[in-house]
Amino acid sequence: MREDIITALDYDGSGNLIYQGKAPAGSTKASALWTIKKFVYDGSNNLTDTQFADGNDKFDNIWNDRVSLSYS
């Protein structure tokens, strides 16, 4: 694991990872320095898709806004 990158994780009530964010070390969760992935599951809790905020892996999103961002 790279020490210059931090990771934030958010799980649903079933324990499934829903959001994974990465940002430069020292970033706050309110800064626009995050790349965020959303994990999509089917009704049987099988992972079916992985999507990026804004459809890309740029470090330009805010972790605290992860739920309201657009993913593709």
Question: Where do the model's predicted regions map?
Answer:
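Viral virion structural and adsorption modules
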Residues: 1-72
